[in-house]
Amino acid sequence: MNWMHGLALLLAAALPSAAVADDAAPLAHPTLLSSPKQARIGEQRLRYRVSFDQLDLIGADGEPAASISAIGYMAERADTDTRPVLFAFNGGPGASSVLQVEGLGPLLRVRNGTRQTLVANPHSILDAADLVFLDPPGTGFSRAPADAAARARYWSDHGDAKAVAAMIRHWLKIHGRERAPLYIAGESYGGYRLALLAADIGDLRPAGVLLVSPLLDATSSDDSAGNDLRAVFDLPSLIVAAAAHGKGELAGQPVEQVYAQARAFALGDYAQALLQGSALPADARNRMAARLAALLGLPPQALLAADLRPDVETFRLGVLAADGQQIGRLDSRIVAPLPTPHADDNGRPSAANDPALGLGRSNRINSAVMADYLHGLFGAGLPQDYVSLDIDIAMAWRFAADDGAGPRPVGSAMRFNPTPNLARLAQANPRFRVLALNGYYDLAVPALGPWYALHHSGVDPARIDFRILPGGHAVFAEEALRPQLHTLLKDFLK
């Protein structure tokens, strides 16, 4: 399950940045290797093995302070120099790499009521590439940082990216894949992580990156006064959500048409109005409020009170409030009763009550089905619990900008953008490509934000394949999309 970038940014805004010291070399555990397995993908039968690798990350005292792990799926009897390797991770921060069982890997996690099982995935991309899923410190079976100093180092944007880069290098080396075509996938905050670590892996010459509902330019989610881009980027996805629930004048139209009209309005009349700020005349302000009300199904007075800049959380709690309902943030098609305030919320953000997330009152989700699966593959030497999601990690996360002089805090919020690092990878490899997959119904990372970041990154637009699909934040969780996604990825990995 994925965690949303908006919560991480919200929680981290008040936290000081911690400097990340030069890392001592991580300590590697021996590779664990499963017995041969078999998958059927389309008409192809494929034999593969599963590996588990772990690196101990070193603290300031020179002792192991945390760990990062990798679960690999490797086809047997393949040419290891020509067969691609795709590394993948989810986001959070605090999410394990559930892309492993949510569309990419040879097994799928399915739910039958409250019970979860793993079944064969006929649309796995294992037929085109070996797959390696990374679990950062505190997720999956990876050990959480042992003390405050280690948390400051490894639960930070730069420390986390360096740990992931170290694991990628380690895995390629010990598995003899340093000459293989390299691809990297990041979902949600994983997109931000990927753009950060791109600065450190140019020598590996990646052939491409897969970005799934990616946070990239933090401006797209920053609510700081004067940042109108956030409101412009959010609006098309808000209008799509309204239409999906029969609200607004675009209700009933195909989602592609709704989004196209909403995007044109957001980048046109709406952006022009917001850019005028307080100089926008009162009559023009009232007309814009009325136009927004017609598109969103909200009262004009509410939009005037929001200074014409509705935010995702207020919208998703308000658009169906008359019916006592909220809509999802990770998937705006989902509807649930409005949350009941609890005395023990302790500042817990409203986004943690997203019905599409499924946290309930807990901050942590352990995956019994993943723990049982991996224990069955590798024996009892692994930890008991597999941590699927821990939002306490997001609450402890530290963000910084790196201007070459080392990490430092950025004003009162996070308005920084590592996406231009991808242009460096493109310059190093003329075959480098970007595939970006986004969901129409994603309110955690509205699709216009990643589009803007990528088309201001310096990457040649001819190398960018940007798709918006009829899904939510977890694009690969959409069963109906998996055949199309498999075809897209096979072409991307050629």
Question: Which role does the model predict for each range below?
Answer:
Residues 109, 198, 202-297:
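A catalytic-pocket lid/entrance helix-loop region that shapes and gates access to the active site
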